[in-house]
């Protein structure tokens, strides 16, 4: 067979392969139009795109075509099998990084820390936060920035994984912000407690970016010490409420994992009375835990039922202390450790809060302020600075 014939055959095979691939994609797209629509992917831990509604505006601005593309991508037949095969292919090819997430050892998916130094945005946030704390000097304030798995479990990252240094960034942020020099502010460093706790138990979920309730309990030891709270570990008892938890980092990364974790609730042995009011939804409940959240798409929402702009918790505690908590979702797992020691707690999530925080502080007689974030979200967050008020930016 001469060279010309070989090239001709190769060209024919390439054309046949391309034609077959296009035909297969078209066939799957057509079949997906008649395939039963799924709302949720259990393996990816996320909601799937639904059939888009045809509209003139959508066609003109291009949103309809984008929605169709998302719908076909999410609803093609046997999606879970294809997702698993893609994950298997990535593993075979040695791909350990997708969308900011590393596939680590021991079944862990670990969100990489992207920053390595203090930037201009960080400095502006420092200025705003310091101003807020100074003008509310009547409050005894605590700032607790929680290390994530990329710091505490850095040995589980894949070898050679390029990343920012979370510990170094934290130490630089605390140092340059001079926040610890404010007389009414205590910086609560829980890194040592977490580093010690991880030796005996699991402090982070393996497929989710949150810490476990055990991790929260370990950090609370240090927080209780700094807040002068008479906390004893034996005052709480752990109960497993979910034994097959898989987190949102699977869907974010595309790294399918069969790994499942447990979700535990730490309940005080002494009975307590609680009334939780969602100020925006104007609803009340007698527990900080949500059965609906536990049984929903994201079982981590068993804590508080999710994230809301403003929640008020009144307890049976006779301490007389009233806490204002500014937080991200990491704090949700720690609320249960706080309720026995505060008569009232107002919880503000700046991402969803639209009221005037300065006015809220002026109206309420808080004794304590706690700012609790994980370092990943704190480094990226812009909502906290916005909520701290216009006065701070002047």
How would you label these PLM feature ranges?
Residues 1-394:
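Extracellular glycan-modifying ectodomains
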């Amino acid at each position: 067979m001469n060279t010309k014939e070989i090239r001709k055959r190769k060209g024919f095979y390439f054309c046949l392969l391309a034609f077959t691939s296009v035909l297969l994609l078209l066939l799957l797209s057509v079949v997906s139009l008649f395939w039963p629509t799924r709302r949720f992917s259990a393996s990816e831990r996320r909601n799937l795109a639904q059939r888009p509604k045809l509209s003139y505006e959508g066609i003109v601005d291009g949103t309809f075509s984008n929605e169709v593309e998302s719908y076909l991508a999410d609803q093609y037949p046997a999606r879970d099998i294809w997702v698993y095969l893609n994950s298997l292919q990535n593993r075979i090819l040695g791909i350990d990084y997708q969308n900011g997430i590393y596939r680590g050892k021991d079944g862990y998916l670990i969100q990489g820390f992207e920053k390595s130094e203090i930037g201009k945005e960080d400095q502006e946030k420092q200025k705003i936060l310091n101003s807020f704390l100074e003008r509310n000097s009547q409050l005894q304030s605590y700032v607790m920035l929680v290390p994530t798995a990329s710091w505490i479990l850095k040995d589980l990252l894949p070898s050679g994984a390029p990343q920012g240094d979370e510990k170094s960034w934290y130490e630089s942020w605390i140092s340059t912000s001079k926040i610890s020099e404010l007389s009414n502010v205590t910086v609560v460093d829980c890194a040592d407690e977490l580093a010690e706790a991880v030796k005996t138990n699991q402090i982070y979920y393996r497929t989710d970016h949150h810490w476990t309730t055990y991790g929260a309990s370990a950090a609370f030891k240090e927080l209780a010490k700094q807040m002068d709270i008479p906390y004893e570990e034996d005052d709480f008892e752990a109960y497993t409420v979910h034994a097959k938890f898989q987190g949102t980092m699977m869907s974010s990364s595309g790294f399918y994992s069969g790994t499942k974790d447990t979700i535990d609730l730490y309940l005080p042995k002494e009975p307590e009375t609680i009334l939780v009011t969602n100020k925006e939804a104007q609803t009340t409940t007698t527990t900080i835990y949500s059965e609906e959240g536990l049984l929903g798409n994201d079982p981590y929402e068993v804590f508080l039922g999710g994230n809301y702009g403003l929640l008020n918790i009144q307890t049976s505690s006779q301490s007389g202390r009233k806490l204002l908590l500014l937080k991200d979702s990491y704090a949700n797992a720690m609320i249960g450790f706080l309720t026995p020691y505060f008569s009232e707690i107002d919880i503000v999530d700046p991402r969803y809060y639209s009221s005037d925080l300065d006015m809220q502080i002026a109206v309420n007689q808080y004794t304590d302020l706690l700012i609790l974030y994980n370092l990943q979200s704190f480094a990226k967050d812009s909502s906290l600075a916005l909520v701290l008020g216009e006065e701070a930016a002047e």
